[in-house]
Amino acid sequence: MMLLYYTLSFILLPVYFIIIFIRLLIGKEDIRRIQERFAIGKQRQNSALDFIQMSVNKEGFTDHKTTSYVDMHRNASLMYKLSLERSYAHSLVWIHAASVGEVMTALTLIHNISKLAPNVRFLITSWTNASAKILSTKLPKIATHQFLPIDNVIFTRKFLRNWQPDLGIFIESELWPCTINEGAKYCKLLLINARISNKSFKAWLKRKRFFQLIIKNFSKIIVQSERDLQKFNALGISDAMNLGNIKFANEKLLVNQEKLSKLILHLDNRRVLVFASTHPEDEEVILPIINNLKEQFIDCYIILIPRHPERIKSIINNCKLHHLSATAKSQNDLPVLNNDLYIVDRFGEMGLFFSVATISFIGGSFKQGGHNILEAAYFSNCIIFGPDMSKNTDIAKGILQNNAAIQIKNGKDLLNTLTSLLNANNALKLKTYRENALKFVENNQKKILDEYLQIIKQFLP
């Protein structure tokens, strides 16, 4: 099966190029970094070679005016041999994080692993532009980011030769067969916070043997829920273990305190509703109810944070269709208070707006399986989400059981829920939801992080 996949990846190579070109045209690829899809560019530094080059310079062998041809030839041969004997000053942990949510988990891992092993350096690979933009402002100095190359043996092997990782950690559900199979030849691989959607589970049941061939490359498999453990078992993987969702361990989003102070003063005691990580399907539900909310609660201000900020033009056009006045953050750094809503078309400032929010609706929950509801919980927001939380089933179930969030079915349900929560008579109810959300995330955080780190520690180089 793996040989067949490798063969197909060769045959379909022209198709990969076309896909990358199309992604480039529609803005899903960064033209300045397109070479990374083909494993061209960055690579791990060879400290042994650097050392020899410094030593040679000190001895003067590289000075062509004083060095004989024999010495230069001998020295070049020595440097070449050392370049093949890869020797590095630091161990390298490679973390693959598909997109934004997994990248936040990767940053938490880097922060905590570096405490356990100060000599370790990190390589983060991801697939999306959104993840790269987040990392451009949050990546620590001990880490490097590179886009994951196309899953073809030519590019995968070149990527692995360039980086020579000592440990690989894959987060959640991206299973690139070639990358994983080749990666296991270089270092031990861990699959953590693993999950399988219902759709993927049905597909893998038809290709169970291929799934097993991929998964056997991992030295340890940690799933995020009992439901996922059952799916792995059904697919013939008996050695997986469930430690819960590591997203509980993600650190509270950073907030620029100077910006926060300005925003609080500017909002002038208005109650803020945040609609976070929204997709078009969410906005179809949200935009029609805004005028109704504004009429009932004049002290209410609405902030929309789309999952993909590049959609800003289409969102503003949709606002006009619903007779809503909207301003983008790229146009005004502070909200225009006499407008109906403010659209945050910038990455990396979610924490700033959760800081001033009373209630947060988490998007992607009408069709995409839901996004991370824990980020808002850290800021003691009252959390609302839609009917589809299939990507975060256990977290959604747990937070609902703890009376720390509300799940709605449709637009009418959302309007009724917000109207009830914003009613002055329900102030205590709103306060309880907010307090419970913070308790829920804090109670789970340390235990889960410690358990994950105990496992990872066993494999650190």
From Swiss-Prot:
GO terms for cellular component: plasma membrane. Pfam families: Glycos_transf_N (PF04413). Residues 47-88 form the RPE1 insert domain. It is an enzyme of class 2 (transferase). Pathway: Bacterial outer membrane biogenesis; LPS core biosynthesis. Belongs to the glycosyltransferase group 1 family. Glycosyltransferase 30 subfamily. Involved in lipopolysaccharide (LPS) biosynthesis. Catalyzes the transfer of 3-deoxy-D-manno-octulosonate (Kdo) residue(s) from CMP-Kdo to lipid IV(A), the tetraacyldisaccharide-1,4'-bisphosphate precursor of lipid A. This is 3-deoxy-D-manno-octulosonic acid transferase. It comes from Rickettsia prowazekii (strain Madrid E).
